[in-house]
Every structure is written in structure tokens, then in C-alpha cells.
A protein has these predicted regions:
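Juxtamembrane interface elements at the cytosolic ends of transmembrane helices
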Residues: 140-178, 240-247, 356-360
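Membrane-interfacial loop-to-helix junctions in multi-pass inner-membrane proteins
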Residues: 157-161, 181-191
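Membrane-embedded alpha-helical core segments of multi-pass
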Residues: 137, 141, 170-174, 194, ...
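Alpha-helical transmembrane segments and their helix-start/interface "positive-inside/aromatic belt" motifs
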Residues: 123, 127, 187-192, 220-222
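Membrane-interface helix termini and inter-helical loops of multi-pass transporters
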Residues: 211-215
Length: 371
């Protein structure tokens, strides 16, 4: 129908692969040679967000995946179109991507007085697309492993291969982190903590893959780590026991530290927010720094190109070796950051729980003796 044509066209535009012209690529390359390699722009361009997914270049043509733009302007209403209409600083439906100012790299709308207005932006950016893809991978892995366990009997041999590895990883997380840190009621929080671990781990690994569908710096985006930290914040405080809140507002300290000036309650109240803040910054900073270091080491090859063949050759060898080392280190960091975030979340949740008598079939540490 005619009414459906704009929507169909938008979807078609969104999934199309755009290709830059040869002349434009040549001009851009010439400009880069004259201005020198902009390492800062390369690094920030990778670790930042974008309205397209750049895949590389073939034969002088830039290949990128245009993502859908979905914004709502207070003056002109909703807009939905492909980001390819905004390439090269172009303006579409009164919208453009700002190149400077406080909204640099974001979609803005030009007002009648010449100022830029930032509309409500619900666009599917590179980070959002990577987040959706990686989340789908986590779901498929969990469903695939769960399917292997359906119909298994108690006397069946232990699973092997990927399923066996997955089971060992889950058991180690539950027995070594979740149960000891949370306590007797660990089963209540185990699904959330396991989900957080595998979500962060898969996103970290996918971020190290240099080509589509990897390469999106999801956990290096502070908005993503903020949501994860808020989720832990809610799990801690919404399910905290009355003893947890009593220790915050009326802890077992001398009375003069609580009244007339509530020194200790104020410190404890601030601690409620500093814990998730530490979770957010730790994950964000570590993942962003790892990506930045790898990119900078790679750029050393091109930065030293003008210093002569001897210098460039030696620095290229050093850069390649250090880059390989950093990539291997990032594989370890990808696991460690997921592990640390899960462990600290379990510790914070455990501190908010009442550790009384263990439940039937459980030890004081929280482990189920019947397993």
C-alpha cells in the first residue's frame, strides 16, 4: 500500500551497504597525507559511537553499514530514515550530524535562529547494534546448552566439548563466587549474576574482533556500564534486609557519631552510591583503555612512516609484537573484567542480605550439600 512505502524504503535503506566514491576516497587520502595521520581521531572514532558501522575499504571504496536514524524533534515530530542520508555532513529533513561543539558527532536540528537543537535520539547506533547482536549470541548459547540437558538422565555421562566447558564455568562461578559471597539465599540471585557475567564476557570478546559483527566497543561505552551498575544497585537495595538498612541509618557505633550530626549514616548513605559508581567506572575504563592502547600501537607503524625505512621497519616489528601481546592480554582482561564485576556485585548483594541460620541442605557458605 502507499502508506507502507516509506517504511519499506526506510528498512531497505537501513540494511543497504554504502560505498564511497573513488574521487571522494582519493581526496580524503590526499588530505590525510597533507595533514598527517590523526591518531586522536582514529582512536576516538573507534571507541566512540557512530550512526554507521564501518567495515573497511576495498579498492579505495569505503564500506559501511548504514544504521537507522530514529529521532523525535519538538518542532517537527518523528523522523525515521537511513543514516546514509547524513554522510559527508549532508542535511536530511532538517537534521544533520554536528561536527563541532557540545553535540559533536550527534544528530542535531537547525533552528530558525541558527542554533542547534538536540532532538530525542532513539537511533540504532553502532553500540546499540553491537549490543543487540551480542545479546542474541548470549541467548543462543544459553538456549543451545539448555537444549542439550533436556532429557538427560541422572546416570548419563558428563557432557563434553563446549557444553562441558560451559557447565564447568557455571559451576565455578556458583561455587567460588555467588554462593560464598551472597550466602544461604544465593539461588535467588544466581540467574542475574550469571547473566551479567556472560553478557559482559561475550561483549568483551566480540569487541576484540576487528571485523563485523565484532569490533563494537560495547562495554567501553559508559552508558552500557551505567545500566549494568544500576541493575546491581537495584538488586542490592530493593532486596536488602531490614538489618542492612539498620546498619546504614543506625549502625552499632557510639551515639555521638549518629546524633546530633549523622556522620556515620551520611557516610553509609554515600557508600550506597559509590559502590555502583565504582563498578561502572572500573569496567568502562579498563575496556576503553585496552582498545585505545591497541589502536595507538597499530598507529605507530604509520606515524613512523616518514621517519625513514630503517626507523619504520624497526618500529613496525615492535608495534606488531606489542599489538599481539596486547590482544592476548585483552583476552585475559575480557574474562577478568566479567569475573570482577560479577564478584563485586555478589559481594555487594551479600552485604545487603541477612546471614542467619542456613537453609535446609545448605552450608553456612551457601553451597548446596546435595549437589
Amino acid at each position: 500500500s502507499p502508506a507502507a512505502e516509506p517504511a519499506v524504503q526506510t528498512v531497505a535503506d537501513s540494511v543497504s551497504v554504502t560505498r564511497g566514491s573513488g574521487d571522494a576516497a582519493s581526496d580524503a587520502g590526499q588530505a590525510d597525507e597533507e595533514a598527517g595521520l590523526n591518531v586522536k581521531e582514529i582512536v576516538l572514532g573507534h571507541i566512540g559511537d557512530a550512526y554507521e558501522w564501518h567495515m573497511g575499504s576495498i579498492g579505495g571504496h569505503e564500506l559501511s553499514f548504514s544504521l537507522p536514524v530514529i529521532v523525535r524533534s519538538p518542532s517537527s515530530g518523528w523522523h525515521c530514515f537511513s543514516s546514509k542520508h547524513l554522510h559527508g555532513g549532508a542535511e536530511h529533513e532538517g537534521l544533520r550530524i554536528a561536527t563541532e561543539g557540545e553535540h559533536a558527532g550527534k544528530i542535531v536540528e537547525r533552528q530558525a535562529d541558527g542554533s542547534d537543537l538536540r532532538p530525542l535520539d532513539l537511533s540504532i547506533t553502532k553500540v546499540v547494534a553491537g549490543l543487540l547482536i551480542n545479546s542474541l549470541i548470549v541467548v543462543l548459547i544459553v538456549l543451545g546448552v539448555a537444549r542439550c540437558y533436556r532429557g538427560r538422565k541422572a546416570d548419563s555421562p558428563a557432557p563434553r566439548g563446549f557444553v562441558g566447558l560451559f557447565e564447568s564455568l557455571v559451576e565455578s562461578l556458583v561455587d567460588d563466587i555467588i554462593a560464598p559471597c551472597v550466602g544461604a539465599g544465593y539461588r535467588r540471585f544466581a540467574p542475574y549474576l550469571l547473566t551479567v557475567f556472560f553478557f559482559i564476557f561475550v561483549n568483551n570478546l566480540m569487541g576484540l574482533i576487528p571485523f563485523f559483527p565484532g569490533g563494537a566497543n560495547v562495554t567501553g561505552n559508559i552508558a552500557v556500564t551505567l545500566v549494568l551498575a544500576v541493575a546491581t544497585f537495584l538488586a542490592v537495595n530493593l532486596f536488602g534486609t531490614r538489618h542492612y538498612w539498620k546498619d546504614i541509618f543506625w549502625s552499632d557505633v557510639p551515639t555521638w557519631l549518629k546524633v546530633p550530626i549523622p556522620i556515620v549514616p551520611f557516610i553509609e548513605l554515600v557508600g550506597i552510591f559509590t559502590k555502583p559508581f565504582a563498578l561502572m567506572i572500573r569496567l568502562f575504563a579498563n575496556m576503553m583503555a585496552g582498545h585505545a592502547v591497541i589502536l595507538i600501537l597499530t598507529c605507530v607503524i604509520f606515524v613512523t612512516a616518514e621517519a625513514g625505512a630503517a626507523v619504520n621497519s624497526s618500529m613496525t616489528a615492535v608495534s606488531v609484537l606489542l599489538t599481539i601481546f596486547m590482544n592476548c592480554l585483552e583476552l585475559l582482561v575480557a574474562y577478568l573484567q566479567a569475573y570482577v564485576f560479577t564478584m563485586l556485585s555478589a559481594v555487594f548483594i551479600g552485604l545487603a542480605q541477612e546471614h542467619g541460620e542456613p537453609a535446609d541442605g545448605e552450608t553456612v557458605s551457601g553451597k548446596d550439600e546435595t549437589r
